Amino acid sequence: SVGFKAGVKEYKLTYYTPEYETKETDILAAFRVTPQPGVPPEERGAAVAAESSTGTWTTVWTDGLTSLDRYKGRCYHIEPVPGEEDQYIAYVAYPLDLFEEGSVTNMFTSIVGNVFGFKALRAXRLEDLRIPVAYTKTFQGPPHGIQVERDKLNKYGRPLLGCTIKPKLGLSAKNYGRAVYECLRGGLDFTKDDENVNSQPFMRWRDRFLFCAEAIYKAQAETGEIKGHYLNATAGTCEEMIKRAVFARELGAPIVMHDYLTGGFTANTSXAHYCRDNGLLLHIHRAMHAVIDRQKNHGMHFRVLAKALRLSGGDHIHAGTVVGKLEGERDITLGFVDLLRDDFIEKDRSRGIYFTQDWVSLPGVLPVASGGIHVWHMPALTEIFGDDSVLQFGGGTLGHPWGNAPGAVANRVALEAXVKARNEGRDLAAEGNEIIREASKWSPELAAACEVWKEIRFNFKAVDTLDPS
């Protein structure tokens, strides 16, 4: 080997290894790389591998004290992106030794830390990660998962129904609890704190928790069904978050909520461990995700954030609607919905899945469809998301002309109609409107809802689309 030689060096000499055969313990990453002009693709791919593992910008003599070959990330494959000039997918393999066990925080600090501010790249985006079985096994994952949740709630054979309480800011705790009661009484399974309801001057968290618990018990007694309200425990410190979760448990609440990106993965994993130890379900909101995942050329795709959440832990996570007001293309969305729910997912580039992922029975996460959806969307949502999902109608419940409880009734009737039609073998995509119309004949609440929302559409092209194949 060559002795120590100072100076700046090309990354590709060390970090571009097309002959490398990936190990099943490696963490694999697919980056979409948009380089500065004049930098050859191998150098860019190698640069990403280096900066996100052992490399630094110059030769350092301490390299001689370790085995670079053992610890370095390797760019093992580069492919041009069809239809894009000068853009590549760089595949990088990281040896498992580089990562702390059971820490999503550490995994991200390594893989998407410094490298994203790197000058040689105009833009870089992490499209997908393959988490090896050996690493997955160091995580607890979701506190309970889909099957345990159904058993706890005694609800089978249909999607679950939720509603975010609006107006999201400004209600007093008692009025807030009243809205919760009306929705649950009308037929919803859950109501939800908005993600930015934490503990503000107009409604402190403890007051809200108390009135919501009262609403849950009252609605359960009247309907004979198990009800829940996602009590948002997100707080300014981890200690305060756990304090809120403890109080929720003392009230006998079935589920709490956390904003996992603004709260951070460390806090989220702590909350998930607390929830499993104490029998609480954990609803996860993805506030801030679009800052990270919306641009096609830079940032991180949501499927990576979704995988990270399954490792860190949550029983529900918001995953777009495909039909409402928020971003989500159908194939891409279904790709990461499967990554959240299923145990084994095959590589399938037509759905944006770059790697085969085996979760080795880590519990699944229920995808939550929420944002600009209403009764007319119900057949499409039932068709797209299937039974293992939570459909959330905020305005689509509370905007009902007769009030909150009738709004909840309308949604529950629409859902039961769609599930019944599906079980009879009808085509929900083609006959959706007809199914809702038929159901509205015997439900005045649904008929009124159909009238209000018959013209509402959110038609914009998605910003983040699949590459042409």
Swiss-Prot record:
Binding-site residues for substrate, renumbered to this chain: 114, 164, 168, 286, 318, 370
Residues the record lists as N6-carboxylysine modifications: 192
Catalysed reaction, written as an equation: 2 (2R)-3-phosphoglycerate + 2 H(+) = D-ribulose 1,5-bisphosphate + CO2 + H2O; D-ribulose 1,5-bisphosphate + O2 = 2-phosphoglycolate + (2R)-3-phosphoglycerate + 2 H(+)
InterPro entries cross-referenced by the UniProt entry: RuBisCO, RuBisCo_large_chain_AS, RuBisCO_lsu_C, RuBisCO_lsu_C_sf, RuBisCO_lsu_fd_N, RuBisCO_lsu_N_sf, RuBisCO_lsuI
Subcellular location field: Plastid, Chloroplast
GO CC annotation terms, alphabetical: chloroplast
GO biological process: photorespiration; reductive pentose-phosphate cycle
Modified residues (N6,N6,N6-trimethyllysine): 5
Keywords for this protein: Calvin cycle, Carbon dioxide fixation, Chloroplast, Disulfide bond, Lyase, Magnesium, Metal-binding, Methylation, Monooxygenase, Oxidoreductase, Photorespiration, Photosynthesis, Plastid
Keyword Magnesium: yes
Cofactor(s) this protein cannot do without: Mg(2+)
Enzyme active site: 166 (proton acceptor), 285 (proton acceptor)
Assembly: Heterohexadecamer of 8 large chains and 8 small chains; disulfide-linked. The disulfide link is formed within the large subunit homodimers.
Annotated protein name in UniProt: Ribulose bisphosphate carboxylase large chain
Origin organism lineage: Eukaryota, Viridiplantae, Streptophyta, Embryophyta, Tracheophyta
Originating gene: rbcL
